[in-house]
Swiss-Prot record:
Keywords: Metal-binding, Pyrimidine biosynthesis, Zinc
Record's protein name: Aspartate carbamoyltransferase regulatory chain
Record flagged with keyword Transport: no
Family matches, as HAMAP family: Asp_carb_tr_reg
Organism: Aliivibrio salmonicida (strain LFI1238) (Vibrio salmonicida (strain LFI1238))
Task of the protein: Involved in allosteric regulation of aspartate carbamoyltransferase.
A single GO BP: 'de novo' pyrimidine nucleobase biosynthetic process
GO molecular function: metal ion binding
Annotated cofactor note: Binds 1 zinc ion per subunit.
InterPro entries registered for this protein in UniProt: Asp_carbamoyltransf_reg_N (IPR020545), Asp_carbamoylTrfase_reg (IPR002801), Asp_carbamoyltrfase_reg_C (IPR020542), Asp_carbatrfase_reg_C_sf (IPR036792), Asp_carbatrfase_reg_N_sf (IPR036793)
Signal sequence range: none
């Protein structure tokens, strides 16, 4: 008798597959790209078993392709995720995740006294990566926050 477990998630014909997202981050990624408001079919796998991560999240978005700009934003949430572009059921392109040097208008500054609160100014952060840790420095109040603090507010 075999003790194999087989996981199946339906393949998509055209679109994007984002795999190896750390567990409990998949929903944040959906909201970041506003995929929760799309009319396209989205397949979500949460807390799936992963030999590398223990557990992971997975997103499959039909007829939608992640841009390089979106991939750099994704790198803040899941720097080791894989992004595959699918055409006719085949992986035609793997999009590398590269941390942006700067990110503007995506996240709120956690500092309630920052000028970005209450003024018509887009937030702007310098991205600092050191020894595997990601920090964001606000352009206006110059406070430095861990990536988790800033992205949890989004």
């Amino acid at each position: 008798m075999s003790n194999k477990t087989e996981l199946r998630v339906e393949a998509i014909k055209n679109g994007t597959v984002i795999d190896h997202i750390p567990a409990n981050i998949g929903v944040k990624v959906l909201k970041l790209f506003q995929m929760d408001k799309t009319a396209e079919r989205v397949t979500i796998g949460l807390n799936l078993p992963s030999s590398a991560l223990g557990s992971k999240d997975l997103l499959k978005i039909e007829n939608t392709f992640v841009t390089p700009e979106q991939a750099s934003k994704l790198a803040l949430y899941a720097p080791h995720a894989t992004v595959n572009q699918i055409e006719n059921y085949e992986v035609v392109k793997k999009i590398p995740l590269i941390l942006p040097k700067q990110i503007t208008g995506v996240f709120e500054c956690p500092n309630s006294n920052c000028i970005t609160h209450g003024e018509p100014v887009d937030s702007s952060f310098k991205v600092i990566a050191k020894k595997g840790n990601i920090h964001l420095k606000c352009k206006y109040c110059e406070k430095v926050y861990s990536q988790e603090v800033v992205t949890d507010l989004h």
